[in-house]
């Protein structure tokens, strides 16, 4: 009877193996003999009210693992903080913690664009390709500077510039002006450095390719020029994107006002901007200055591109001239072969098995051979002269000269037309006086 009492607990486990059911029955029978009931599960765990299948357990474990993985791989920024005095602090922050501290949204720290300057909640967010920065009225944050070779600029040049010890022109203005100018100056110097590296390489390669001393074109030089041309195209794209980003800011007056962070956070600076120095105009002048610098770089890159295109035209002309020389030589050899074949028919005629009295004379061989070579040479010279006349450049068309009488008549008419108003005016005044 004790076994029948615990039988309903065994029914949900009917899917288990036969050996497991037998072991459970033996345990129940032993417990009944001892006068106490032993639960199927351990005392520390409570048996579930409904049976759990293997699929449910697998899904539960998968969700836990995915959550743990997401928590472990959360994006962490290596942050470098610069304050107004030039003090530098480096630390690490998770992305969620960072945008909560800066009062920004998660989308503001994605940095998806190649070049962008935006404002969010009295913060300036700048990205110039690999350089990511957040500017506030009190400090500057540089994000993810590792493996970018920025240590020299970050820890030696930038702190002194922000503290007012460098060569920036925005020292009397608030902190965000110095930060923006320092970042723009760094990026312009980077573009200028790329151009200064490419320019001598391209000019040296072009000089070697266009040199008239070399009759053939070196393929290795062409490969180097191709690689430098690709690098120049990338540089032109970077300069163009930089100019477009600056131009977008210059076209929007509201954006220029929003870039002046201290103006909206400090009442004293706001009064000073409204009565004395207009910070929006200063920001516009700053951006216009760097737009002109980028425009100068764009012009230099365009000049290099024009040189490459002109050199390419010269190279094609040289290749065409070499090709024409080879074609002309081939044509001359073809005409020579035709001439020899034409007068070689005489030798073919004597090579037939025909009897004639000419074969008995030994001088006839040399006579026929001489006639063959002389005739072939004459025909070849005639063909060459015909080819030369056909390949001569055509003369420019001669303009028909006008007769001298027509020119003199036209000059007289011009003189009369120029003197007619004055003569009429003078005659009228004389008649009026009379």
UniProtKB/Swiss-Prot annotation:
This is Magnesium transporter MRS2 homolog, mitochondrial. Pfam families: MRS2-like (PF22099). One of its GO terms (biological process) is mitochondrial magnesium ion transmembrane transport. InterPro entries: MRS2-like. Residues 54-330, 393-434 are mitochondrial matrix. The GMN motif acts as an ion selectivity filter. The chain crosses the membrane at residues 331-350, 362-392. It comes from Rattus norvegicus. It is found in: Mitochondrion inner membrane.
